[in-house]
């Protein structure tokens, strides 16, 4: 166990020399370890506990993009047996937040301001959650594109989350 911890520490140190973003450092260090992305996703969900209700697992993270999966299970189903749209919105807020933290310039900070979503088809399978950010980071309102897809690739929810971006004090 001690060797595994030392190995992980060395990997993190190597990434910190090339990148300054904590979320990306953790992602790159943990993606190579079996179950590592599940651990990372759960750690992030502990920061904002309501994310634990949908148990998202990050599958891909890079500057400007976060993807995660969300299992269709009884805890997130509605009365007709599909994934409840509010659970999907919760998952979309998760990927948006992770994507923003992995992408935002160090002199800026953000807060979510609003969400607009359209329900475009039934969510009758596990869900893939995606958030995409453009590279234009300016003070003021900014929209992050979000989409949720079924396993067959069919979109079930499309929309955007508006952020309020300000300079750090």
Where are the predicted features?
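A generic structural signal for short beta-strands and their flanking turns/coil linkers
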Residues: 54, 64-66, 111-115, 125-127, ...
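HotDog/MaoC-like acyl-thioester-processing domains
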Residues: 2-35, 124, 132-169
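Hydrophobic alpha-helical segments of small multi-pass membrane proteins
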Residues: 86, 90-94, 114-119, 146-150, ...
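Active-site-proximal helix-loop elements at catalytic-domain edges
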Residues: 34-58
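N-terminal short leaders/motifs
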Residues: 2-22, 66-74, 101-112
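Hydrophobic beta-strand-centered segment that forms part of the acyl-chain substrate-binding groove
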Residues: 98-134
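Hot-dog-fold acyl-thioester-processing enzymes
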Residues: 24-25, 46, 71-97
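Catalytic strand-loop segment that frames the active site of acyl-thioester-processing enzymes
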Residues: 50-83
């Amino acid at each position: 166990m001690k060797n595994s911890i030392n190995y992980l520490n060395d990997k993190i140190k190597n990434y910190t020399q090339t990148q300054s973003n904590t979320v990306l450092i953790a992602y790159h260090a943990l993606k190579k370890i079996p179950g590592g992305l599940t651990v990372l996703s759960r750690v992030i969900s502990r920061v904002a506990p309501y994310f634990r209700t949908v148990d998202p697992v990050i599958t891909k993270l890079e500057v400007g993009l976060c993807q995660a999966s969300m299992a269709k299970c009884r805890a997130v189903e509605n009365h007709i047996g599909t994934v409840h749209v509010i659970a999907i919105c919760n998952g979309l807020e998760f990927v948006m937040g992770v994507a923003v933290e992995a992408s935002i310039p160090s002199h800026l900070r953000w807060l979510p301001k609003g969400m607009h979503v359209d329900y475009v088809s039934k969510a009758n399978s596990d869900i893939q959650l995606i958030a995409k950010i453009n590279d234009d980071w300016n003070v003021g309102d900014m929209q992050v594109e979000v989409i949720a897809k079924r396993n067959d690739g069919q979109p079930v929810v499309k929309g955007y989350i508006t952020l309020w971006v300000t300079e750090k004090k």
